[in-house]
Each structure stands twice: as structure tokens, then as C-alpha cells.
């Protein structure tokens, strides 16, 4: 029997959470995130600073549109395998 590791879901911006996002950007991984009750799955493009906010830019796989998500607005996120 094979055990499957759980995908870590982050609810706060801890150093581990930021490391996971940075790794997702480097590896162009998918990120499932929830903002204002809406769930998105995007391909991580870049992390940047906008004013006083850190922003994740993610591309929607179906349309190719790039959306910007302020990290402080995220309720949860998980980097998908």
C-alpha cells in the first residue's frame, strides 16, 4: 500500500509559505488559491512588490490571462504537484 503525502495548505504568510510560492514561481507550478471566497488555479508566473504589497502574478491555464493576487488578500493557497 502506498501512502500519498498531503498537499500543504497555507493560511498565513509564514516563511515556509513564502518559500513555497517562490519555488512555485521558479518551477512554473500550479497554485490553488482562495481570495474573497472564490477559488482559482493558476500557473505561478512571478512574485513582485507593488507599493507596500507583495503580489503573485498567475496565468489562468484555460485563457492565458495573467491575474494579480495581493498575498495579504489570500485566504488560503496550496502549491500543487
Model-derived features with residue positions:
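Short glycine- and basic-residue-enriched patches
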Residues: 1-81
